[in-house]
Amino acid sequence: MKRIFTVLLTLLLSLSFCFSQNPQAEAFLREDISRVACNYHGYEFKDYKYSRVPKGYEMVYLSHYGRHGSRYMTYTKGHEYVIKKLTQLQKAGLLNADGEELLRQTKEMHVMNEKNLHNLSPKGYQEHARIAERMFAREKKFFRKDLRIRGIASTADRCQSSMNSFCGALVRQNPRLTMDLDSKEEYMSYISNTSGFEETVHDKAGLIIDSLNNTILNPREAIRPLVTDLDEAYKLFNRPVRFEKYLHVVASIAEDLPVHYRPMKLIPFEEARKLWYIKNLDLYLNHCNSVEFGDIRIPYARSLAEDFITKADESLSGGCYDVDLRFGHDYPLMAFFSYIGLDRFNERYDRNHTDNWISSRDMHMATNLQIEFFRGKKGDVIVRFIHNDRETKIPALGPGPFYDWETVKAYWRDRY
């Protein structure tokens, strides 16, 4: 009976779903096919202009959260499944040259991932070092002082390594900086708070995602570029959707690894766009301010918002730290951005319109938020938000980019 209910619910979900097509998202993906990787996409370094700080204000503090940089896989089953199916096709003499190359390269990446499971990749180290250098360059006057910096990281090795790379780059710019770095389980209650998330959101959102996997994907089109005889090849797939999904994983993580091969180019654009859409939807429903689950998911970020407030007020009141750095993960960061009402995370979308939010633009590897604090001659404090090197805003509080800190605090504490 339970299985019948699940099947019926999945059918109803698929019938009520509309595969919307946001022209902005489509253009963004066409410009660079690697962006189909969603949150596996690497950091894009771009140059931005910044507003002049109001006269009479001086930077006195900076608070930050950065997602770990590009990494190796955290599991092996995706590569293993793709290798298994491609090997079957090879034995049947059905792989074309692109399919053969995909098999060879996937085997090499699989070995690489097994040796470095969960760890930061060389690209990830480079991302955080470069982000730190750009932050230093933007605020040279502040960072050339004898500052004391506190850094905390998730207990995951890739986050600790990101912190070390980031802070090492800062010290190379100014050897007089004092660093107090730490990583403890106790920090996880706010730096990566997802306790109870599986029961409250994940399983319910999963039903929606499963319904799309089986209704809008066309795995024949994903397999076509790899084989010599599509009809014969397709007979060897008992779960073709699974192959397509894992092919997307293999193609997505490739750009994070120390390899030049880019399998994403093998997936036809229309199919790649659908894969992006589903993964983008998955991320939004599970961790952003969705109509369906936002009221349940976003309050998990309150503890992180309080950490930002508490540490900022400590510093502004004469505390010993001039900079607070945090290194964690994308899931809590998405919820936090939604909680604080950050631009591009402040709008609420239902499951039919989540492609108005673009994960590979706003939550790629090494995504970070830097909040700069400036004190005026009268003692008042204003703040500016820098998201992935881009000056941004809190739309509910006005156009910005500078906001009164007391107003920001009151707004955050009144949320949820």
Protein language model features and the residues they cover:
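Bacterial Sec-dependent N-terminal signal peptides
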Residues: 1-23
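Signature for phosphate-centric chemistry
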Residues: 21-148, 154-324, 328-416
